[in-house]
């Protein structure tokens, strides 16, 4: 294919992907798909991960889109990002705005039940047990001032 025939934007799962990048790198532009997941999707779609996304034909892009949509059914449960939904108990792989909304719902649920993690989220402190004595300070600078002679 010539340089003029490249598609600079390829739309997959309501996201514009960069057509000038390799398939496995371009797929990471979708929120919820990282490097490992993108490699798995290219293997499921039977597409070369190092091929340029904009140079693929429509049939290959369709296979990639289908692999993204059916990712949950084709991989083991430990490879998805929502292994046991709190409300429904089902195994799902969330992408895009669904992932953002579900994350916000989880944080709001923790705040509402007043769990330790919810309170830490509310107050803007570190949640996962990191040290807070010397790092993560915001606001005024804390330090020792030298006495001027």
Curated annotation (Swiss-Prot):
Q: Which GO terms describe its molecular function?
A: rRNA binding; structural constituent of ribosome
Asked if the keyword Transcription belongs to this entry, the reply reads: no
Q: Which SUPFAM superfamilies match?
A: S13-like H2TH domain (SSF46946)
Any Gene Ontology CC annotation: cytosol
Q: Which UniProt keywords apply?
A: Ribonucleoprotein, Ribosomal protein, RNA-binding, rRNA-binding
Give me the stretches of Low complexity compositional bias: 132-143
Among PANTHER family, the record links this protein to: 30S RIBOSOMAL PROTEIN S13/40S RIBOSOMAL PROTEIN S18, SMALL RIBOSOMAL SUBUNIT PROTEIN US13
Tell me the protein's name: Small ribosomal subunit protein uS13
**Taxonomic lineage from the root:** Archaea, Methanobacteriati, Methanobacteriota, Stenosarchaea group, Methanomicrobia
